[in-house]
Amino acid sequence: LKRINGINVQYDQGEARFGQVRGTSADLSSVTINGNRLPSAEGDTRNVQLDLIPADMVQTIEVNKVVTSDMDGDAIGGSINLVTKSTPYKRMFSATAGTGYNWISQKAQLNLGFTYGDRFFNDKLGMMVAISYQNAPSGSDDVEFEYDVNKKGEVVMVEAQKRQYYVTRERQSYSLAFDYDINPNHRLTLQGIYNRRHDWENRYRVTYK
């Protein structure tokens, strides 16, 4: 998504989270999945977390930088549509496995993906199933300073904070799609997707005044 001209993404703990279209705020753009509007997982904003949907589940990304007349008029910035994997024209299978290690959290990371699709009954019935699992412990640390101006007009440091963040994100996603070709001009389609995400975050702060 970030490689598209006019699109910027906001990061959280090294992962892309929000998409901005044409420099507007993320809450001024709509995010849909297969054309269906996604609500925000946060109660006090319209921002939609793009990292809720794993990349293994997405086939294409459609971006409209201008809302057209056939779209909901609730997005000044534009629209981002995530298209999930559809049934293939022939049998296909793919599996991915990855791991890593985060030195700050001192924990291992795991990423698994599975996709299978095929057609049955003389290619009239198509099926696609996709499963994704990710467990990604991470961490970050920094030092933050606060300055003020004293009575002499001098800029002085009034506070220093040493912060550490330990984050574990676990994602589980399941996608299932069917289609049935009634004739060359008509097709029935059934799609479903289930996503589950957990975030655990520990914050530590030491303040010097």
Predicted regions and their residues:
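Extracytoplasmic beta-strand/coil segments of soluble accessory domains associated
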Residues: 1-37, 65
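Short acidic/polar hinge/loop motifs at secondary-structure boundaries
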Residues: 9, 19, 36-66
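N-terminal periplasmic accessory domains that precede
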Residues: 17-22, 32, 48-51, 63, ...
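Residue-level detector of the transmembrane beta-barrel scaffold of outer-membrane proteins
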Residues: 30-32, 60, 92-96, 126-128, ...
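Flexible, solvent-exposed coil segments and beta strand-coil junctions
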Residues: 42, 58, 89-97, 150-159, ...
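Outer-membrane beta-barrel pore domains and translocons
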Residues: 64-66, 83, 96-102, 132-134, ...
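Outer-membrane beta-barrel domain signature
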Residues: 71, 101-103, 163-165
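Transmembrane beta-barrel wall of Gram-negative outer-membrane proteins
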Residues: 107-206
